[in-house]
Amino acid sequence: TPQPVQPAPTPQGPLEPQPVQPPPAVPAPGQPLVPQQQQTGVPDPNATLAGKGTDTSDVAEVTLSPKPVLVLSGQTSWDQGFQKLSDSFKALRAEAQRAGLAVAGRPLTLFVETTDEGFRFDAMLPVAIPPGGQAPTVGADFRMSTSPAGAALRFLHQAPYDDIDSTYETITAYLEAKNIVVKDAFLEEYVSDLADPGDPNLEINVYVQPK
């Protein structure tokens, strides 16, 4: 049986004017400006950049909003790539905890450069910036930045990480068929944790951005 709607509580006295929030403070010189967290309340550590896909055969046109991210750059061989990324995310989470930053989304990897031997990457962890928008102080190996933003195509990988090459072959074929030219750097978002490269239920969003 539907419950009756409760009336809004009656104020016990005259409403007090709310203080005006000061503008965000400017970060110290050399620190990149990071967008202030738009959401209120507790940050969601499982939030994705543009929702979740449900079918690996679907290609979604999405718009990525910039998020403050804690970044750890690195490079690795293809054979060691999965373990290197997994270790990078553990390091990012530990640094976020040390710096008092709440995790505000699923981890990301921006593949900056790829070769036959391996790749250079920026591992990213979305975080909530404390009120005031000041750039937090982080360790020497880390930096604050923003996640890629703008129009993108989202492809869904639901299979072991060992099989991700097949997803990229599908992406390449789709882009060629549609005559879409994209930026060289592509972005992976790990809806599932990178624990086992053979996990058949691993879920990854792959974003490519048209030029």
Task: Give the label of every model feature segment.
Residues T1-K211:
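A solvent-exposed interaction/effector surface
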